């Protein structure tokens, strides 16, 4: 047994996100249809307290179009972040979520994933943004809009 001491050190750092807008209306329609067809397969038992599909949706219509986009972008941002190291991106899971008013996602991380992403098919007026609790008093909320694809590090 090792005597392990935990120390919380004050750290000033940035949370880096990578964002781009996708203009894929036909893909979006397919994804929306599949999310509606699947309904809530997780029964609100995950961190997402809303309608959530299965975990591995990559073969479903629309999702199968999003996957190569996500893999390509993750490779590009990895080369930027990790100084041109050769990267072989892979997808562990991809799912869909549909929120109603008052439904939330509990703060969580996606460790051990290097990257996580969220893709907004639509963004109702006054919808809350994507929020990072790690930013505390600095805010940390990203305003969402239809077609916005946001990558962030999996440990946050």
Task: Give the ranges of each region predicted by the language model.
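Catalytic core of non-heme Fe(II) oxygenases with the double-stranded beta-helix
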Residues: 88-156
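Non-heme Fe(II)/2-oxoglutarate
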Residues: 1-87, 104
């Amino acid at each position: 047994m090792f005597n392990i001491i935990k120390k919380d050190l004050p750290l000033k750092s940035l949370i880096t996100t990578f964002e781009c807008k996708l203009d894929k209306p036909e893909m979006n329609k397919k994804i929306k249809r599949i999310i509606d067809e699947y309904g809530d397969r997780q029964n609100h038992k995950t961190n997402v307290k809303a309608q959530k599909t299965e975990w591995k949706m990559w073969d479903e219509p629309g999702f199968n179009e999003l996957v190569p986009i996500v893999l390509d972008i993750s490779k590009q941002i990895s080369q930027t972040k990790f100084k041109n190291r050769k990267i072989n991106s892979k997808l562990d899971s991809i799912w869909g979520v549909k929120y109603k008013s008052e439904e939330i996602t509990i703060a969580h991380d996606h460790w051990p994933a290097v990257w996580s992403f969220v893709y907004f098919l639509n963004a109702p007026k006054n919808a809350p943004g994507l929020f990072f609790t790690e930013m505390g008093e600095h805010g940390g909320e990203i305003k969402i809009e239809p077609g916005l694809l946001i990558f962030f590090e999996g440990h946050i």
